[in-house]
Amino acid sequence: MGHNAPPRGCAITLMNINEIDRVLAAEPRNVRALILKADHLANAGDARSASSYYLAALKAAGPPQQVARELQPELQRARSMYERYASQYQDYILGQLTAHGFDPATSSPRFAQSLDIVLGKKRIYLQQPRYYYFPGLPQVQFYEREQFPWLAALERETDAIAAELQAVMQQPAAFAPYVQGDRKRPPNEQAGMLNNPAWSAFYLWKNGEVVAENAARCPRTMQALQDVPLARVPNRSPSILFSLLQPGAHIPPHNGLVNTRLICHLPLLVPGQCTFRVGNELRDWHKGQAWLFDDTIEHEAWNRSGETRVILLFDVWRPELSQEERALVVSLFEAIDAHGGGRKPDWEI
C-alpha cells in the first residue's frame, strides 16, 4: 500500500459504513463523512467511487483559507488520493484511445478538447453576450482559418500595415485608453482598466463610422480591408483599431456584447510572451498570423514581456448568418436606436 493510501484502522473503525451513510443522508456536504466514505470505498477496492467522494469532499470544503486547521491534513490527503486516481484513470483512457489510433498531435482538435473536458483538465465555456444573443450559432472559441478566404490576402499586407502603425506610434498621444468612462452611464471599474492607458486604441473606424483623420494616415490598412465582410451596423460597427497592450499589462476576463460577429486579430508588433485566452484555449500572438474568435466567450490577454504589443483588431459577420439574418439584425438595432431618440448607443468592440 502506497504512502497515500487511506488509514486502515483508525478513522474507519470509529464509524462504520452505515453510520457514515446516515450522516451523509442528513448532511450531504459533511466533509469528514465524505472523506470517511471515500476511505471505505478505497479500502474495498472501488477506486472510481472513492475518487468521486474525495472530489465531493474537496468541493464541499470550499476555499483553503476557510478550512478549519484540524481538517487541513485530511483534505490534503483527500486531494492526493483524488489526483492519484485521476492520473490512473487518465492513463487508462489514453492507453485505450491510443490503441484505437488516437494521436493528440494529429487527431481531431475538437475531440482532443472534449477529452480534456471529460478528464477534468479543461472546463466548458459558452457564449455569454452582454447585450444581444442570436440563438442556434455554434459554440466555437477560435475559428478555423479555412472558413475565411480573405484572410491570406490580409496577412500578406502585414508589413505595409505595420509600417503605418509605426508612423502612428511616433505620436504616443494618438492612442487613448480603450475603456473610457461615460458620465451618462453607471461607473464600471472594468477590473482596473477604466481610463487605463495600459490598454489603448487608435481607431480607424469606431462604432460604424470612419475616423477620417486617422484613416487618412493609414491608406494601406484601409485598402487591405476592402474585401473583408465587416459587420456593418449603423452607429455600432464595424470598429477597426490598432489595439496596444503595454509591457506587463493584463486585460482581465470579459465577454463581448453580441454573438452575431467575430473578432479578428492581425498581430503587428509582438515581442513574445504575449498570450491570449478564449474559453479554455491559450494561444500566443505571432506577427502576421491572424485568427478569428467569438468574443462572447470569456477571454483575456497578457503581455508578459518588457515591450509593447500591438494588433490590428476589427469585427466581421459570423459566417453562419445568412444575408437575410444580417439584414434583420441591422434593422433590429436601427429600431432600438430610433426608440432611443437617436442617442448614440453604449457600444464597444
Where are these regions (language model features)?
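Conserved structural position within tetratricopeptide repeats
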Residues: L24-A25, K59
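Short beta-strand His + acidic residue motifs that chelate non-heme Fe in jelly-roll/DSBH
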Residues: I251-H254, T275-F276, F293, H299-S305
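A short beta-strand-loop-beta hairpin characteristic of the jelly-roll/cupin
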Residues: L268-K287
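Conserved metal-binding segment of the jelly-roll/cupin
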Residues: D284-E298
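Fe(II)/2-oxoglutarate oxygenase catalytic core
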Residues: N30, D39, N43-L241, L245-N255, ...
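A short hydrophobic beta-strand segment most commonly corresponding to one strand
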Residues: L262-P267, L292, E307-S322
